[in-house]
């Protein structure tokens, strides 16, 4: 297997790794129930109904 001809500098190594960092998912607090939810997504409440933007969009099955 070939080896590098020149040593990679700290700057080049760190610039390459600059995109490797992980970001935590965004979390919002539901206004009515106070539970933690992902924003811009529908979620199932404790009663089994679907909620979006604080409004019930589907009844429990």
Swiss-Prot record:
Residues 1-16 have a biased composition (Basic residues). Coiled coil: none annotated. Pfam families: Ribosomal_L32p (PF01783). Residues 1-47 are annotated as: Disordered. GO terms for biological process: translation. Keywords: Ribonucleoprotein, Ribosomal protein. GO terms for cellular component: large ribosomal subunit. One of its GO terms (molecular function) is structural constituent of ribosome. Residues 29-38 have a biased composition (Basic and acidic residues). SUPFAM superfamilies: Zn-binding ribosomal proteins (SSF57829). InterPro entries: Ribosomal_bL32, Ribosomal_bL32_bact, Ribosomal_zn-bd. Belongs to the bacterial ribosomal protein bL32 family. This is Large ribosomal subunit protein bL32. It comes from Bdellovibrio bacteriovorus (strain ATCC 15356 / DSM 50701 / NCIMB 9529 / HD100). The gene is rpmF.
């Amino acid at each position: 297997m070939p080896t590098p001809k020149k040593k990679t500098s700290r700057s080049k190594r760190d610039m390459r790794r600059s995109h490797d960092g992980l970001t935590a998912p965004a979390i919002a607090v539901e206004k009515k129930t106070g539970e933690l939810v992902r924003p811009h997504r529908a979620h199932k409440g404790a009663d089994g109904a679907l909620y979006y933007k604080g409004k019930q969009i589907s009844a429990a099955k």
